[in-house]
């Protein structure tokens, strides 16, 4: 074991990147790097990047600039870039940023210790090659366990859908599913370390196992994971609406450990726009899935994604998106102005929507979503909810956790409750959380 040094990882983008950052920390621990939340203390800084939108990509270059002068005042300091921008740019990043030491793509996490050792010797390296599926299967690093009540578990990587606006297949590669036995073993190991809730991760979890002969379907995997003794809750993300199967919907009715929340990105409420996006479903088909999920799990909470200003989007198309939102009543929504990405099919479509109109549509959509989110939060006030207590809140004098429907609840209670299921009465709503009081008498919680 070498002398301890400090690692700071800054994460951009999706939950898959959050999970990858946890794996980065685990891989580098054996190289003598301990995690720190302070970049000024770090001997190695890694930016784990996102390239889904141009704005996210530009932000990376801005953050790299912050570290330009660090080496002159800190001997041995190293700077690295991983994730989707690294996969997309590769060697060009080293050429554009002379003070950058190492670059590693989405298929190269397993090489990170070797790349860091090379950087410590003064060798600048970029490793962004895709690797074959058989090799990838054997190189899925598990997320390390350092306490915590919840944990991400990767079940698959990549995407074969090629939505016309999306760069993910080009930077994450084609779909590949982990062996179900490996996933279940990782869940069992996590529970033995004190984990009570797992979130199953993939770019399109609904495709899990479909291309692997003899493997479980995603619904079958959920049912097997639910059999793990000591596990309280199961979540998953992200789902492609076209691949939501009747078997998966049945899990919401028949598997009590599966939480009553689903992230179901619609992207648009207009059939014309959905067709140009190559989403593979219609508005009516999406709503059929929503209603089937509601029938299976009354009270299920929906979150999603919406894109405004896609090339050719008319005001009528936009109003179709607004009306879809009003039908679904999302608990929360990630919404963005369309951003053309290199290599994607939509990048070649002539953009007919002005920047001013795109911003106007985004503002109107987000105003509506904030109203619906507030209404949803208010509906919880006065109810009793079961909360998986995850830890001490940012305020320090309260605990926090999540209800089945994925809303954060803060409440005053003894820290001995961390890691348990607590019954809480919701007393107040806020924009991004709920406030509650611990229940001392017996009663029915949702």
UniProtKB/Swiss-Prot annotation:
The role this protein plays is: Catalyzes the methylthiolation of N6-(dimethylallyl)adenosine (i(6)A), leading to the formation of 2-methylthio-N6-(dimethylallyl)adenosine (ms(2)i(6)A) at position 37 in tRNAs that read codons beginning with uridine.
Q: Which residues form the TRAM domain?
A: 378-440
GO biological process terms held by the UniProt record: tRNA methylthiolation
Subunit structure, briefly?
A: Monomer.
Q: Where does [4Fe-4S] cluster 1 bind?
A: 14, 50, 84
Give the residues the record marks as binding [4Fe-4S] cluster 2.
159, 163, 166
Keywords for the protein's UniProt record, in alphabetical order:
4Fe-4S, Cytoplasm, Iron, Iron-sulfur, Metal-binding, S-adenosyl-L-methionine, Transferase, tRNA processing
> What are the subcellular locations of this protein?
Cytoplasm
One Pfam match, given by its short name, reads TRAM
Catalytic activities: N(6)-dimethylallyladenosine(37) in tRNA + (sulfur carrier)-SH + AH2 + 2 S-adenosyl-L-methionine = 2-methylsulfanyl-N(6)-dimethylallyladenosine(37) in tRNA + (sulfur carrier)-H + 5'-deoxyadenosine + L-methionine + A + S-adenosyl-L-homocysteine + 2 H(+)
The record's comment on protein family reads: Belongs to the methylthiotransferase family. MiaB subfamily.
Top-level EC class? transferase
User: What sequence ranges are listed for the domain MTTase N-terminal?
Assistant: 5-121
Q: Which gene encodes it?
A: miaB
Q: What is its EC number?
A: 2.8.4.3
User: What is the recorded name of this protein?
Assistant: tRNA-2-methylthio-N(6)-dimethylallyladenosine synthase
What's the superkingdom here?
Bacteria
- Name the cofactor(s): [4Fe-4S] cluster
Give the source species: Geobacter sulfurreducens (strain ATCC 51573 / DSM 12127 / PCA)
Q: Which residues form the Radical SAM core domain?
A: 145-375
**Cofactor note (record):** Binds 2 [4Fe-4S] clusters. One cluster is coordinated with 3 cysteines and an exchangeable S-adenosyl-L-methionine.
Per UniProt, what is one GO molecular function of this protein? Answer: metal ion binding
Mind telling me which GO cellular component terms the entry cites?
A: cytosol
């Amino acid at each position: 074991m070498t002398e301890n040094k400090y690692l700071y990882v800054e994460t951009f983008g999706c939950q898959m990147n959050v999970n990858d950052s946890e794996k980065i920390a685990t891989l580098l621990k054996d190289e003598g790097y301990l995690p720190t939340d302070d970049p000024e203390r770090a001997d190695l800084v890694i930016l784990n990047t996102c390239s889904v939108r141009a704005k996210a990509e530009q932000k990376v270059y801005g953050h790299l600039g912050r570290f330009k002068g660090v080496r002159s005042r800190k001997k041995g300091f190293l700077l690295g870039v991983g994730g989707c921008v690294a996969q997309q740019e590769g060697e060009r990043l080293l050429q554009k940023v002379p003070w950058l030491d190492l670059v590693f793509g989405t298929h190269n996490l397993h090489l990170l210790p070797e790349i860091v050792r090379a950087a410590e010797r003064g060798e600048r390296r970029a490793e962004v090659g895709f690797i074959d599926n058989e090799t990838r299967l054997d190189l899925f690093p598990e997320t390390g366990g350092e306490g915590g009540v919840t944990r991400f578990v990767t079940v698959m990587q990549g995407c074969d859908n090629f939505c016309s606006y999306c760069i993910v297949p080009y930077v994450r590669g084609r779909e590949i599913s982990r062996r179900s036995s490996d996933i279940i073993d990782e869940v069992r190991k996590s529970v033995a370390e004190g984990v009570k809730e797992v979130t199953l991760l993939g770019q399109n979890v609904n495709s899990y196992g479909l291309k692997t002969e003899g493997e479980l379907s995603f619904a079958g995997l959920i049912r097997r994971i639910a059999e793990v003794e000591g596990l309280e809750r199961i979540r998953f993300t992200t789902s492609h609406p076209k691949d939501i199967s009747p078997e998966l919907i049945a899990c919401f009715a028949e598997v009590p450990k599966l939480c009553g929340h689903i992230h179901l990105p619609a992207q648009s409420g207009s059939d014309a726009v959905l067709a140009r996006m190559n989403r593979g479903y219609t508005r009516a088909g999406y709503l059929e899935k929503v209603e089937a999920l509601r029938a299976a799990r009354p009270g299920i909470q929906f979150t999603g994604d919406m894109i405004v200003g896609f090339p050719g989007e008319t005001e009528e198309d936009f109003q179709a998106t607004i009306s879809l939102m009003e039908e679904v009543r999302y608990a929360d929504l990630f919404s963005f102005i369309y951003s053309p990405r290199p290599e994607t099919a939509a990048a070649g479509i002539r953009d007919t929507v002005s920047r001013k109109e795109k911003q106007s549509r985004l503002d109107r959509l987000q105003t509506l979503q904030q109203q619906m989110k507030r209404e949803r939060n208010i509906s919880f006030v006065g109810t009793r909810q079961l909360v998986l207590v995850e830890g001490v809140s940012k305020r320090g004098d309260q605990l926090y956790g999540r209800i089945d429907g994925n809303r954060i609840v803060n409440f005053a209670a003894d820290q001995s409750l961390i890691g348990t299921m607590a019954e809480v009465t919701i007393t107040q709503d806020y924009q991004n959380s709920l406030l509650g009081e611990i229940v001392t008498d017996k009663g029915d919680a949702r």
